[in-house]
């Protein structure tokens, strides 16, 4: 489920070099760098474990790293959701009832993350509506853009304060309507802080239809296209599949994504998540 060991060094070293080169580009910005993780084709593809794995590798390079999980559902948190609906609930030290991906982050990174590192659509709207009721918007027409997206960017920056790198995992997949405000907010933050402070990683799934017996890249190409419609172009693509992604498929993805060949990472199924 995680990036195979021999490839982990590749993606981490590339991220390391990308951020090292950005240190002197915008000296006025002293905040963290952001690694934004999105998913393509299907959910449950392993975004949380991959995010946690990359975070651990970046820690080994000496970066202080934290992680944020975005869940686009209207529920305020995962506390009242059935386990069969959304998996087990992870309880943080400060009492937050959170998506189970926070548990993976804590175990892999060795951190006690606060409940505020889990953003949901319900939380964002709740905060904005409460502010509107208190008159904090001074009579403005409160809208998804900019008020909702501004609250998202505020939460992301708050979560990253004091760290070198913030991993931001956006739940679901590219193309989900409920993810639109979060993708817009991420792009807005990238524009405001500078693209040199951002790296985008797409985790996609390459199916192998039984009647064909070969890996198909077309769904991944469509995911890349849908992500580009938001002005976001992946710097790295992690290819989840039953088996390793071969050279032919990697080259097809490379052409469609316009990324270096070694930024396309094969992540086949594994017997244990710690391999």
Where are the regions a protein language model picked out?
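Flexible phosphate-sensing "switch/lid" loops adjacent to ATP/NTP-binding sites
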Residues: 2-9, 15-275
């Amino acid at each position: 489920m995680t990036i195979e060991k021999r490839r982990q060094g590749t993606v981490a070293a590339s991220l390391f070099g990308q951020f090292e080169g950005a240190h002197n580009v915008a000296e006025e910005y002293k905040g963290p760098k952001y690694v934004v993780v999105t998913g393509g084709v299907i959910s449950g593809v392993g975004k949380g474990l991959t995010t946690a794995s990359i975070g651990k590798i970046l820690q080994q390079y000496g970066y202080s790293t934290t992680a944020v999980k975005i869940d686009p559902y209207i529920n305020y948190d995962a506390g009242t959701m059935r386990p069969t609906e959304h998996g087990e609930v992870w309880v943080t030290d400060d009492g937050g009832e959170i998506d189970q991906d926070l548990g993976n982050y804590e175990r892999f990174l060795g951190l006690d993350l606060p409940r505020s590192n889990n953003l949901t659509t319900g939380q964002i709207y709740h905060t904005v509506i409460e502010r509107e009721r208190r008159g904090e918007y001074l009579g403005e027409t409160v809208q998804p853009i900019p008020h909702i997206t501004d609250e998202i960017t505020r939460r992301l920056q708050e979560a990253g304060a004091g760290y070198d790198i913030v991993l931001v995992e956006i739940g679901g997949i590219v193309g989900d309507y409920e993810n639109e405000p979060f993708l817009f907010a991420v792009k807005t933050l990238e524009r405001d802080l500078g693209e040199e402070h951002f790296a985008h990683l797409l985790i996609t799934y390459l199916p192998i239809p039984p009647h064909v017996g070969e890996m198909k890249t077309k769904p991944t190409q469509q995911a890349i296209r849908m992500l580009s419609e938001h002005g976001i172009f992946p710097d790295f693509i992690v290819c989840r599949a039953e088996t390793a992604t071969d050279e032919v498929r990697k080259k097809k993805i490379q052409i469609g994504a316009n990324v270096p060949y070694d930024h396309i990472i094969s992540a086949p199924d594994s017997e244990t998540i710690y391999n």
